[in-house]
Amino acid sequence: MAQASQCIRNFSIIAHIDHGKSTLADRLIEYTGALSKREMEAQVLDNMDLERERGITIKLQTVRLQYPAKDGQTYELNLIDTPGHVDFTYEVSRSLAACEGALLIVDAAQGIEAQTLANVYLALENNLEIIPVINKIDLPSAEPERVKQEIEDVIGLDASEAILASAKTGIGIEDILEAVVAKVPPPQGDDNTPLKALIFDSYFDAYKGAISYVRVMEGRVAKGTQIKMMSSGKVFDVTEVGMFTPALRIVDEIKAGQVGYIAASIKNVRDTQVGDTITDAENAALYPLPGYRKATPMVFCGLYPVDSSDYGRLKDALEKLHLNDSSLVFEPETSSALGFGYRCGFLGLLHMDVIQERLEREYDLNLITTAPSVVYKVNKTDGEVLSIDNPSNLPKVDEIETIEEPIVKANIMVPSDFVGAIMELNQEKRGNFLNMDYLSANRVTLHYELPLSEIVYDYFDQLKSRTKGYASLDYELAGYKAASLVKLDVLLNGELVDALSFIVHKEKSYARGRRLVEKLRGIIPRQMFEVPIQAVIGQKVVARETVKAMRKDVLAKCYGGDISRKRKLLEKQKEGKKRMKQVGSVEIPQDAFMAVLKIDD
């Protein structure tokens, strides 16, 4: 093994959202002088405006720091920043696989949260050296001793040497860097064996093609090397290799233990899947690195342009986003109510939200979104098994044997005062209680099995509002379970509006149908004729409301006179309205499609 790799340390930062991860990364960059004071800005590793505004990390970033340690050596520290949100767990697991150590950041006031725990388990699975850091100790409400105790009780790490720091004021930054040098082991690996490099991220550059962020585990890679992707077998010629400072800097080669990027004129990000192994095309490794899997979308929804002439622009925008985000899937679909659009699949709700916001903001599109749905497995009577992500594609009732829905295993951390409120919420959401653990006298973790379809609507908002914002949630897919599910359709003036259909549990179908038609009655504007709104399951109408017609007072000119004269005028008006109703079409406002999401409000 090359002596040089003894001076390399690869580490990442893991934390719950808002515990100060990006700010700490800023301080480390500033302290080691990777960027000058002039180039520094808040959250320097968060490139998107959206990331800065929401204060979240979506795409993971990487930076190489040169640190002259107290022992006289200069070390190369590769910091791999990870997203903190549950939707991006797979990205976190891949970036942790590229490291030997991790800084565990815990907020001195809030203590351990659900996502902290989930990411710690990922780090332990990858056998990383974990260094606990208690951040925000400058806050008046900081309780470092309590948090130390929590780290020991909940995670089982020795917190006696936990570093007390404040990323905001710069306290403890040198201690953190020294701890990384002292505790994180140097990378193992031989420069002279066949190349094995783990892709932990990729993005698309208009000039260089898809660029892979890699951690070289074995061997070396330089410009001109022929590389092969082990999952697809595709071969490319390397045009450039380099490091991150955080900007890309070209170097001659990157070798075992180092983190860098590879550009090889790859036309499509789909060819550089996160978690895949790159090897030398001529002198190939026998086995890929473990842990690769394709990202599977969990939540689907329809995206339609408000102005149908924007369909082409929407297609271009989705394709451009897909270049940078291979977990986004989309295919064209048509709706009788909304025209042409796309059915899109996302990793989770935040992912869906972020993509929609980027489409509207970066590509200036005005979109209508249909209610999100999950992938159901339908076992038909003839033995065929279908995966349905769009309620409109559900087969007829008499062809269905059973419908299975995706189930998630949720861990909810709350102060013990709110346990009752959370149990009540989970009961409403058809949750199945597994067990609960007391982390301390006043903090509890509840373990539940919940249907994913109940989480995708407003579960997170409800969770926060019922616990005054104190609850934190982490979930993972736990398979499928058969359930009594039905498709609820909406008829407007006798016409089916496919974009308003959704799949719902039978027990809740009547109540939801009732609430939906009431909501739609308030949203759909009055027409010149009466508009019935019906919620139907199969052939059966379960709820109905009517939008009353606007009518002219045809009796205004009759002062007194014969009743039969008045009746004749009213009958004539009624006949006219009837004819209008047969040919009239109802304009559906955009709010109507959002009403499905907000039925429970």
Curated annotation (Swiss-Prot):
Q: What GO terms describe the biological role, i.e. biological process, of this protein? A: positive regulation of translation
Q: Which InterPro entries match?
A: EF-4, EFG_III/V, EFG_V-like, EFTu-like_2, G_TR_CS, LepA_C_sf, LepA_CTD, LepA_IV
What SMART domains does the annotation carry?
A: EFG_C
Residues holding GTP: 18-23, 135-138
Q: Name one GO cellular component term.
A: plasma membrane
* Localization per record: Cell membrane
Gene3D superfamilies, per database record: 3.30.70.240, Elongation factor 4, C-terminal domain, Elongation Factor G (Translational Gtpase), domain 3, P-loop containing nucleotide triphosphate hydrolases, Translation factors
Q: Which domain of life is it from?
A: Bacteria
Where do the tr-type G domain residues begin and end? 6-188
UniProt-recorded name of the protein: Elongation factor 4
User: What is the native source organism of this protein?
Assistant: Desulfitobacterium hafniense (strain Y51)
